[in-house]
Each structure stands twice: as structure tokens, then as C-alpha cells.
């Protein structure tokens, strides 16, 4: 019988406190010089949480505020669903929906004020950003220019639902979220080159590995790896470790051109729930601490074109929201959202056509 090697599963315990330390409002206050300008709305009202958790997406229609997402649909032969409506009306049960203008008007106004102050923003809750729901906006990013885009993005995200319902899943000291306060973070929008985002694994105050976050091939990254590692070493040992209460964590950073500064994007728990990207968690957990405090970790990069990666867009498994999969959305809401989506795409196409004509 031939010998066969087996890989031992290495347990990586994580506590509730470690997860809480990775909440944006906690760690961002420790490193204000290394994060983008943002507004944090703390202790969100229960009605807002219910609004995010309810079936369907109810957008506010304000009299003095125009939004393309709430403009009345003009019926024509392409969107006349009268044959559907009679049957559906009899089968639909009345459910009291949470509405922004009625149930949390103060928060709604704070969101509008934040947009006026910061311009476009990218939202996130305590831990997660709705990166899986960018399909719902015409620009296919998390860039929100108006309050209805915030509502659409947050409502359509499974990552946001994870924060609301399973924030402490897998914690050794319990997963109960009772009494947990939620925050909404609005970060001023900036265009980031995904090739220059990196994930850094820190175990027992030592860097044990780093990887690019975007899993596509960029031919210029390898020759810059020493520059990237110098900046990563500096921010981990001189900035983060002296103030962060835990010695094991996963740090997301951004290093923009001309590669003389580094910014903190996020801090995540050192746990299997955090995506290990180009590493495996067993691989990370098995890395021994450096000898003589001299760290010689690997910055792992994609070294060749991965055509399969291009064929499978990131977060594509989430590009149909759970509400639609379960057919639990209000049918009328689905029809209206579909029509508005068509109108937005048509408007975007006209604007692009106008821009191209003006350039010629």
C-alpha cells in the first residue's frame, strides 16, 4: 500500500472581541491619517435595520427631490402588465412595509446631508461593504450619488445581511447578536486601482504573507514587490500594531502611484471567514514565526493570465439577490425596478453617445 500524505486541519479560533475590534468605527478612529474622509452614523435605528431585512426594496418618493429611481413609469405596449395584475392582486397579502420618510426620517435626512458634504460615497456597515450588489447600479460600482442608490445597494447585498444576522458566526464564545449596535459608514468616493490593493496576514505580531486582492494578472506588479513590501512592513509595525488590541488580524491596504504612501482599506479577523485569496488558511496557519525577528514573508501575486478568472466576475454568485431567488419580492416592485433599470441604461447610453459626439 503506497504511502499517502494527509494535511492536518488547523483550527483558527476567533472571539467576539476580535470581530468587534474589526468594526470600522472602532479601528478607523485609531488611524485617522490612513483612511479616506468618512462619516459614521452610529447606533442605527431598529426601523432602518428592519428596512434592510424586509422583502423588497421600498424607495422614498419626495415631493421636492427628483430621483430617476422613483420617476413614474409611463405605460406603453412594452411595459403593460395588465394581464398579470388581476390574478396577482387577489393573491398578494398586505404586509406593512418600512418606509424611510415615515419610519426613519431623521436618518434619511442625515444620509442626504452626508451626500451633500462628501459628494459621492461608498457605503458599508460595521464590517462589510455591499461589493456583491454593485450589479444593481448602472455604474456597476459602489459609488452612490444619491440616497436612493444607497438604499438599493444596501438592500440588495448578502454581505450586509451577514453583518445584520451572522456577524459573530463561528466565534468560540458564542454567535448571539442580541444587543449589537450597527453603524453605517459613508466613505468619500475615490477611484481605486484594484491592482494596487493588497491583503496582509498578521499572526502573533508578525507578517506571515500578503497577496494582491484582485485576482487578475498585472505585468508590472512583480518588479514593484520590494517597494510594496517596504510600505506594508512600515504600516504594520509602525502604525497598526502599536495601537491595535489584537496581534493577529488581516489588513487590507491600498498603495496608489507614485508608491510613496499607503492607506488602510479594512481590518478583518484572522479567521477562516476572511477570504485568504491566493493562499489557503491551512497554509497561513502553518507558517512558523520568523527567526531573529527578521521577516521574510511572501507577497503572492498572480503570475500569469487567468482566463477563468475573467470568465467568472468577482461576486457573480451574488448577482441575483436572495429576494429574487426565493421569489419573495412584491411582483409590482420587480416590474417597476426592471422598467426603471431599462430607462437608466437607455439614459446612460444617450449620455455616452452625446459625449462621444462632442469629442469628435
Swiss-Prot record:
It is found in: Cytoplasm. Induction: Expressed during exponential growth and repressed in stationary phase (at protein level). Levels not affected by the presence of mating pheromone (at protein level). GO terms for molecular function: ATP binding; magnesium ion binding; protein folding chaperone. Its main location: cytoplasm. Pfam families: D123 (PF07065). ATP binds at residues 124, 127, 129, 131, 187, 189-190, 197, 199, 213, 252, 266, 268. Keywords: ATP-binding, Chaperone, Cytoplasm, Magnesium, Metal-binding, Nucleotide-binding. GO terms for biological process: eukaryotic translation initiation factor 2 complex assembly. It comes from the Eukaryota. The keyword Transmembrane does not apply. One of its GO terms (cellular component) is cytoplasm. Mg(2+) binds at residues 266, 268. PANTHER family: CELL DIVISION CYCLE PROTEIN 123 HOMOLOG, D123 PROTEIN. Interacts with the eIF2 complex gamma subunit GCD11 (via C-terminus); the interaction is direct and appears to be specific for an unassembled form of GCD11. Interacts with the eIF2 complex alpha subunit SUI2; the interaction is direct. Interacts with the eIF2 beta complex subunit SUI3. Interacts with DMA1. Interacts with DMA2. ATP-dependent protein-folding chaperone for the eIF2 complex. Binds to the gamma subunit of the eIF2 complex which allows the subunit to assemble with the alpha and beta subunits. Belongs to the CDC123 family. This is Translation initiation factor eIF2 assembly protein. It comes from Saccharomyces cerevisiae (strain YJM789) (Baker's yeast).
